[in-house]
Amino acid sequence: GLLKAALNLHKFGINKLVVIGGDGSLSGADELRDKWPQLQQELLETKQITQQEADFCKNLLLVVMVGSIDNDMAETEMTIGADTALHRITESIDDLRSTAYSHQRTFIVEVMGRNCGYLALMSAIATGASVVFIPEAPARKEWRENLCTLLDAGRNAGRRDNIVIVAEGAKDTEGNPVTAADIKDAIQSGL
């Protein structure tokens, strides 16, 4: 892991890194930076690098940028990748809507984002989705009945399509996951 990364950086004379990623990438880069002196010493002692290579790479300099479609990093307005992900989601939902409309269907779209409902909420607003489930607003205990009532009322009012968006980390107020399969089962049994 880290020792091999340090070896490769020394062998290629790389002492500056730009890391763009999410929690795992940024944590890994921070750990590499923290352990750099010990890794370098081990590489010297085992004669895997020369003193000249060690001197050139004495300090490891990092520039880190948050790149995460989840848009869940504090102190950033928008993470690299979130806007592109939102754009792709809204395009995909727009493509689904014509089929949903022409066949009078309900489509359930599960959106990535782990425990952050940003993509689900923003895509629901952008596409005029019927319902959205997000982790930040847990669904009430009676969400299944409420969902069916809402969708039925829309059909009775002449709505030909329904789009239900669920964030992958959505839960109910008791902490139970709310998944696309759960929503499908609720609609099939309740309508």
Name every feature range the model reports, one short phrase each.
Residues 25-26, 70:
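Alpha-helix N-cap/helix-start and coil->helix boundary motif
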Residues 22-23, 67:
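Beta-hairpin (beta-strand-turn-beta-strand) motif
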Residues 8, 19-21, 27-61, 79-191:
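Accessory alpha-helical/coil subdomains and C-terminal extensions
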Residues 1-12, 16, 55:
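Glycine-rich nucleotide/cofactor/substrate-binding loop typically near the N-terminus or early
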